[in-house]
């Protein structure tokens, strides 16, 4: 997820979208008592500054098992930032998959969702 979001931010003229599955948006192994970190805030600001609102398609998701259990708060902050910045549902999609983990088997099981979103005509 991180490398896909970076590719879109860095080369928006090349990549028209990004599928960010189980994005490690905490950028570290977080302290669960910490509500927001400087690294998480910097990642959100980077996204906000480098991807034109509704200028590409951006898909993000996560589960709630293994590493993904740490992403819920950070992902909620990203979702808030995206919607407050004006992203619409044609260009930004977030999905939550309860009971799924940060692993290839779970990503494979839901790969159709980001692909259909990214490849759909506007």
What positions do the PLM features span?
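Non-catalytic cap/lid and distal C-terminal segments of serine-dependent acyl enzymes
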Residues: 1-122
């Amino acid at each position: 997820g991180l490398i896909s979001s970076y590719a879109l931010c860095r080369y928006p003229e090349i990549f028209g979208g990004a599928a960010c599955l189980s994005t490690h948006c905490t950028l570290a192994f977080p302290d669960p008592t910490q509500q927001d970190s400087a690294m998480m805030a910097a990642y959100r600001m980077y996204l906000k500054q480098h991807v034109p609102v509704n200028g590409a398609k951006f898909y993000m998701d996560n589960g709630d098992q293994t590493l993904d259990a740490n992403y819920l708060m950070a992902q909620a902050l990203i979702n808030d930032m995206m919607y407050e910045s004006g992203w619409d549902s044609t260009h930004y999609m977030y999905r939550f998959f309860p009971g799924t983990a940060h692993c290839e088997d779970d990503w494979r099981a839901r790969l159709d969702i980001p692909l259909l979103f990214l490849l759909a005509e506007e």
